[in-house]
């Protein structure tokens, strides 16, 4: 049927485009992928002819990082970078580097950071297969109209345990009704009628430390520890910003 032929043609074109894009992402900017059809014994065989062309390489790497603290963190772990001058202009590696830097900053208190703050400009050098790459770090903006500022580092202020599921359904913590609480080793534990887990079990499985910088892997470790506790249906960790003096802090509510 004509519609089947059209559909096949569309799929072939899409596959060619995807393969071309994949080649270009690996640095082969002039790559051309062409579908080639053979008919053998009334059967249609489809192959793709790939002309890769010459790969583009990174001639120079520059960094446009105005935030001094972040620049220093990046310098400290520069040995782990995925980028080097002379490597192929590989878009996947450029993106992996954005993610690597983001993961590191999330260990150092940058609670609100994400990889969209990091971008690149790439200029091809005329009549060569070379590219000059600059990495940019955008400043933090609370809202679009706010003045740009340095990215903030957050410290953990208090960690609270709430052991009643209905409590966490309430998005505004001010509206939480709790009729009992205890303090164990400096951690407030709030519950409604009955405390289902021993305080020691709660604190032993916690990896988030008051007074330390926010650290994303600690949050993930806390999730996996609590996920192994049979008595819990699910775990939820929420952070609320609070300003203590001129330090940005986070209050954590676990459960």
Where are these regions (language model features)?
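Interaction-mediating elements
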Residues: 1-228, 247-250
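Long hydrophobic segments that form regular secondary structure
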Residues: 230-233
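Solvent-exposed beta-strand/coil patches in large extracellular/periplasmic or lumenal scaffold regions
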Residues: 235-238
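AMP-binding (ANL) adenylation modules
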Residues: 241-245
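Extended beta-strand-rich architecture
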Residues: 253-255
